[in-house]
């Protein structure tokens, strides 16, 4: 619990700080504990607030609305939460925008102010500092001439008066100046948390918006040298600077864990605790001018705009944040948004902030989008009615009038806000090096990706690619459904187009997809698949009540009270032992009401409960019990269906009712094991425990239960032959998560009479799911290879073998294969192909033909002198031939080479009995030249000579071996023995020592490495032989490329004998049960400073023969 409060406090640090200051100015004290409790409740019932919420009056009212809805659903909302919410709402109302301002005539008629009666007896000073304890509803106050302005000013600005040591000097109302450019008259100062003395209404005053204003002494005026500042600058407003608005940045929980709050707020809070009040000041501040400067006699003192640069701490934090997380990471966006809205940034500040934190390429992007945004904003300013006098020079901080800091410090608030919006938008468009902004159409949710992560990616891409806010919102809402995975789409579909107008669509989607794809959701699906109980109501709150116990959260069929009663009744019934054998089956000591047998002790089928009505089977699912009784004569399987249906006709009669006269007999098919299916899986075969053969003269038809089809479970229809003697199985697929327990009835087997058509004597071959007379389940197919596709056809009872020719219009029979007694005639048309046939005949009759799969067709073939028969498109079309081209895994050339080397399809080349084990032999082709041919095979390469190393010192370097866990020590011993057998290392007594360790690869194998940092420090470096890659522009186009992978190249290059002892290492024994073993490398060790240079030297020597025969070549290694 303490950790949760600490997290809430750190996450909402800026909100808590602002609320405390705001309420303190209104005379209301709220403990931090109550505020933390308030934000805990808000996070619980308003999941959208951490991502999208701000301290805006509209959002705060929405929070109250959703808390009320949660209270109506039975959730307990503490009374202190309601009180704190109402107080903060009353304090936030003065910050509403001008469009939402409330006129006095619209305000409530009176405000209820309950003040303590004891305040009337205290002194005037105490009276001025006391405030109301309860505030019912915020009231819009209007000033009259009876208002005590001094007391009113003390209520709003107590700290200011304490610092000055005197009361405020209020300026009287001015009717000559327009409202937009004049300070707010003192009589129109709004009050939300009012003092003891109530303010009376004056209905003659115009409506006033809720705003706080600083004391009258701090009125803004330009420097005295010019009445309107610099040339071209409009008159600066002389009103009071508004009170700082509440934080509008959204909290983002994806910020780094160690820095939940903003860096800026951490600095500000730390400075406040140390008594440094300058931490709150803006870069451009308003300071009172000395007496006599700028203010004329009889006028209130004026202030002068002065610029103060950023602190090094802020710039450093921005630079580190961009470097570590990226310019557009959630953490950096939050930090930048806090700085932008917490300071009065001029164009010079934005340029310094970007230059100090971004890379040159990123700064170029920022500057480009800044200029682009300025051009768009200037067009809007000119098109406004009336036009706004803010030009491009002012927004960019350039030109004769706005190039200096002192000139930019005098910019209007409207210009500052436009610069802020343009620069924030330009910052969002910055792309990281090497990354491109994807299209929002390509942002799709992964199968295991949480829905909020997908929406966050979609919003980020849409924000970068779509400038219009309304269009961006529509696109995000559309793609949030279209590009979601099927599970989330199923959850969102009921909400699509039905979200209330006042609710946020994305927030409702996020709440609907809460938990999908997580561990809880997977556990729910598995539990649902195993138990068959729908668990949706246990995950989300169930709106209805149980009809059995009246509690909320479950249905009557899942009621724990009812289940407990059933268990009690069952235990009471089964507690007594039956006195004798079961009167129903006569083969077990159990009660007749609990008998589940289908056959009696003689093997005869049982039916009915011998109690009432027509004979009925006991309450048992499936055609047979889960563990059926096997009568004598049936070893290890259930009775054949032929005997089962024979017994059905011999059932006893009850109540003198004749058995139903039906032509079709049926049996229920059930599962004999637990079955679980998930969407997307291929059809599965489910055993039923029922075996053939069927009764003679019948055929079986398997049909699924309609109740399962309505749920999305499909039992595929299949046919069972009468002579099939195997187990009957069901083919099932499902579009929803589904499960079945052993014994559940899921299908029916219908016995239909088999009627032979005509006098056909074709033998029927038994098989499940087909009555195909030929017993074939696949058609003829041929794979394109070196061999020609040849198939056989029967024409008029005579078999012909021919080539499948999809380019031939007609079929052709070779003249030497045409029977002489078959009539033929001279063809009217000729045959044109690769060549032209001289003698062409055609059959005088239309012949009957059977294809390779007994497809019946007719043909009138052409006859000519060709070496083999051709089956043209006239026959192929009647046979239903198709040409398919699946994407091969390997090209035909690669498959041919791999087949010669022992490739086994489906397994590949390797060591584990799936291909050739011996290495490739170097075969020399005497007819060609090039890499791998005679000049390389016949060339004699001298054995490599070791290259000695140059040492800075001969003083031994010894670094102790650090401890390793047991698993790594065991792997280290095995690798050392392997290297010792290969001759790469040898025993050592050297005074040098370096630590050794092992790492595990992705394949699971271990790799031994030596930490040679201390040894490398005393080695004289050689420098690389090939420091860089050649320029691609100088390489001729389409040059041949060969890649040679030298496995363990370092281990084939020897070390100089005098250098081996310097690469010694120690392998400790497990648990120090024996002395450690020491070795030293005889070959180039990995990690040595000069190993790459020596390796390049040896590879260059090995490729020397290539250089002789191929002078123009590039070698990269």
Curated annotation (Swiss-Prot):
GO terms for biological process, alphabetical: proteolysis; viral translational frameshifting
Q: Where is the Reverse transcriptase domain?
A: 58-195
Instruction: Give the Peptidase A2 domain ranges.
Output: 800-875
Q: Which residues form the active site?
A: 805
InterPro entries assigned to the protein according to its UniProt record, in alphabetical order: Aspartic_peptidase_AS, B_retro_matrix, B_retro_matrix_sf, DNA/RNA_pol_sf, dUTPase-like, dUTPase-like_sf, dUTPase_trimeric, G_patch_dom
Localization: Cell membrane
- What happens to this protein after translation, modification-wise? Myristoylation is essential for retroviral assembly. Alteration of the glycine residue leads to a block in the budding of particles and an accumulation of Gag inside the cell. Specific enzymatic cleavages may yield mature proteins.
Bias (Pro residues) ranges: 232-247
> What does the UniProt function comment say about this protein?
The products of the Gag polyproteins of infectious retroviruses perform highly complex orchestrated tasks during the assembly, budding, maturation, and infection stages of the viral replication cycle. During viral assembly, the proteins form membrane associations and self-associations that ultimately result in budding of an immature virion from the infected cell. Gag precursors also function during viral assembly to selectively bind and package two plus strands of genomic RNA. Endogenous Gag proteins may have kept, lost or modified their original function during evolution. Early post-infection, the reverse transcriptase converts the viral RNA genome into double-stranded viral DNA. The RNase H domain of the reverse transcriptase performs two functions. It degrades the RNA template and specifically removes the RNA primer from the RNA/DNA hybrid. Following nuclear import, the integrase catalyzes the insertion of the linear, double-stranded viral DNA into the host cell chromosome. Endogenous Pol proteins may have kept, lost or modified their original function during evolution.
Name of this chain's protein: Endogenous retrovirus group K member 9 Pol protein
């Amino acid at each position: 619990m303490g950790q949760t409060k600490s997290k809430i406090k750190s996450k909402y640090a800026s909100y808590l700080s602002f609320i405390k200051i705001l309420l303190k100015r209104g005379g209301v004290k709220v403990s931090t504990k109550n505020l933390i409790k308030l934000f805990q409740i808000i996070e619980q019932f308003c999941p959208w607030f951490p991502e999208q919420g701000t301290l805006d009056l509209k959002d705060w009212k929405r929070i109250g609305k959703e808390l009320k809805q949660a209270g109506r659903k039975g959730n307990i909302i503490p009374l202190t939460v309601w009180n704190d919410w109402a107080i903060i709402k009353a304090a936030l109302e003065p910050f509403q925008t001008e469009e939402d301002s409330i006129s006095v005539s619209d305000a409530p008629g009176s405000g209820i102010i309950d003040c303590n009666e004891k305040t009337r007896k205290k002194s005037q000073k105490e009276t001025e500092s006391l405030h109301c304890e309860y505030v019912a509803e915020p009231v819009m106050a209007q000033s009259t001439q009876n208002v005590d302005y001094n007391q009113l000013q003390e209520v709003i600005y107590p700290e200011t008066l304490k610092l000055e040591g005197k009361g405020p000097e209020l300026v009287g109302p001015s009717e000559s100046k327009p409202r937009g450019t004049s300070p707010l008259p003192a009589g129109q100062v709004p009050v939300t948390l009012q003092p003891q003395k109530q303010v009376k209404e004056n209905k003659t005053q115009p409506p006033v918006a809720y705003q706080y204003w600083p004391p009258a002494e701090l009125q803004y005026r330009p420097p005295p040298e010019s009445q309107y500042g610099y040339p071209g600058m409009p008159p600066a407003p002389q009103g009071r600077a508004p009170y700082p608005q509440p934080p509008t940045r959204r909290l983002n929980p994806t910020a780094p864990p160690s820095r939940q709050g903003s860096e800026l707020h951490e600095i500000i809070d730390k400075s406040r605790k140390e008594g440094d009040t300058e931490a709150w000041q803006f870069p451009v501040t308003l300071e009172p001018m000395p007496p006599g400067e700028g203010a004329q006699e009889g006028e209130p003192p004026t202030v002068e705009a002065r610029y103060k640069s950023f602190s090094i701490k802020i710039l450093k934090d921005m630079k580190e944040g961009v470097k570590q997380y990226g310019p557009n990471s959630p953490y950096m966006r939050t930090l930048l948004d806090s700085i932008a809205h917490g300071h009065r940034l001029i164009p010079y500040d934005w340029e310094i902030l970007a230059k100090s934190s971004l890379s040159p390429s990123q700064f170029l992007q920022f500057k480009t989008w800044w200029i682009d945004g300025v051009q768009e904003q200037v067009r809007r300013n000119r098109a406004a009615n009336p036009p706004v006098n803010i030009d491009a020079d002012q927004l960019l901080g350039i030109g004769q009038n706005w190039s200096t800091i002192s000139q930019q410090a005098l910019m209007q608030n409207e210009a500052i806000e436009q610069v802020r919006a343009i620069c924030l938008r330009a910052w969002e468009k910055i792309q990281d090096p090497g990354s491109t902004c994807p299209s929002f159409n390509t942002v799709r949710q992964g199968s295991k990706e949480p829905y909020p992560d997908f929406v966050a990616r979609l919003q980020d891409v849409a924000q970068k690619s779509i400038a219009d806010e309304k269009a961006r919102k529509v696109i995000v809402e559309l793609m949030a459904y279209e590009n979601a995975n099927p599970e989330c789409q199923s959850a969102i579909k009921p909400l699509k187009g039905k979200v209330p107008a006042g609710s946020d669509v994305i927030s409702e989607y996020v709440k609907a997809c809460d938990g999908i794809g997580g561990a809880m959701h997977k556990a729910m699906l598995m539990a649902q698949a195993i138990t068959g109980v729908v668990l949706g109501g246990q995950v989300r709150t169930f709106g209805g009540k149980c009809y059995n116990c009246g509690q909320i959260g479950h249905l009557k069929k899942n009621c724990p009270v009812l289940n407990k009663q059933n268990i009690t009744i069952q235990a009471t019934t089964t507690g007594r032992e039956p006195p004798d054998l079961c009167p129903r089956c006569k083969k077990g000591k159990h009660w007749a009401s609990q008998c589940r047998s289908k056959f009696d002790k003689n093997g005869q089928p049982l039916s009915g409960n011998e109690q009432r009505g027509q004979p009925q089977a006991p309450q048992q699912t499936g055609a047979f019990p889960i563990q059926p009784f096997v009568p004598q004569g049936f070893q290890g399987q259930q009775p054949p269906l032929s005997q089962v249906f024979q017994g059905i006709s011999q059932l006893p009669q009850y109540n003198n009712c004749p058995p139903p006269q039906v032509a079709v007999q049926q049996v229920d098919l059930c599962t004999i094991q637990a079955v679980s299916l998930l969407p997307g899986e291929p059809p599965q075969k489910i055993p039923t425990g029922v075996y053939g053969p069927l009764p003679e003269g019948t055929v079986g038809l398997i049909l699924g239960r309609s109740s399962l089809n309505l749920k999305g479970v499909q039992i595929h229809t299949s046919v069972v032959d009468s002579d099939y003697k195997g187990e009957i199985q069901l083919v099932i697929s499902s579009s929803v998560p589904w499960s079945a327990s052993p014994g559940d009835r899921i299908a029916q087997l219908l016995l239909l009479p088999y009627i032979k058509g005509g006098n056909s004597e074709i033998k029927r071959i038994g098989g499940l799911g087909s009555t195909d007379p030929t017993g074939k389940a696949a058609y003829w197919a041929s794979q394109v290879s070196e061999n020609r596709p040849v198939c056989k056809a029967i024409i008029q009872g005579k078999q012909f073998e021919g080539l499948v020719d999809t380019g031939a219009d007609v079929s052709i029979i070779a003249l030497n294969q045409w029977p002489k007694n078959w009539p033929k005639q001279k063809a009217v048309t000729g045959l044109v192909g690769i060549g032209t046939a001289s003698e062409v005949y055609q059959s005088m009759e239309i012949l009957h033909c059977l294809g390779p799969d007994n497809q019946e067709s007719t043909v009138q073939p052409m006859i000519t002198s060709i070496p083999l028969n051709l089956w043209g498109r006239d026959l192929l079309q009647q046979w239903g031939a198709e040409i398919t081209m699946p994407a091969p895994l390997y090209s035909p050339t690669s498959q041919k080479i791999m087949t010669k080397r022992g490739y086994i399809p489906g397994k590949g080349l390797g060591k584990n009995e799936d291909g050739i084990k011996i290495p490739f032999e170097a075969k020399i082709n005497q007819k060609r030249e090039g890499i791998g041919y005679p000049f390389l095979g016949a060339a004699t390469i001298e054995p490599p000579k070791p290259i000695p190393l140059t040492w800075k010192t001969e003083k031994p370097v010894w670094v102790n071996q650090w401890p390793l866990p047991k698993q790594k020590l065991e792997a280290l011993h095995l690798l050392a023995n392997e290297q010792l057998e290969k001759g790469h290392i040898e025993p050592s007594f050297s005074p040098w020592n370096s630590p050794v360790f092992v790492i595990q690869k992705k394949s699971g194998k271990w790799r031994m490495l030596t930490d040679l940092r201390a040894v490398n420090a005393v080695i004289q470096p050689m420098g690389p032989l090939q420091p860089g890659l050649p320029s691609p522009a100088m390489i001729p186009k389409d040059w041949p490329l060969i890649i040679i992978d030298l496995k363990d190249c370092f281990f084939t290059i020897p070390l100089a004998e005098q250098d081996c002892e310097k690469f010694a290492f120690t392998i400790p024994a497990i648990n120090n049960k024996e002395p450690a073993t020491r070795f030293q490398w005889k070959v180039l060790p990995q990690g040595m400073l000069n190993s790459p240079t020596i390796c390049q030297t040896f590879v260059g020597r090995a490729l020397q023969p290539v250089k002789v025969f191929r002078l123009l070549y590039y070698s990269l290694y």
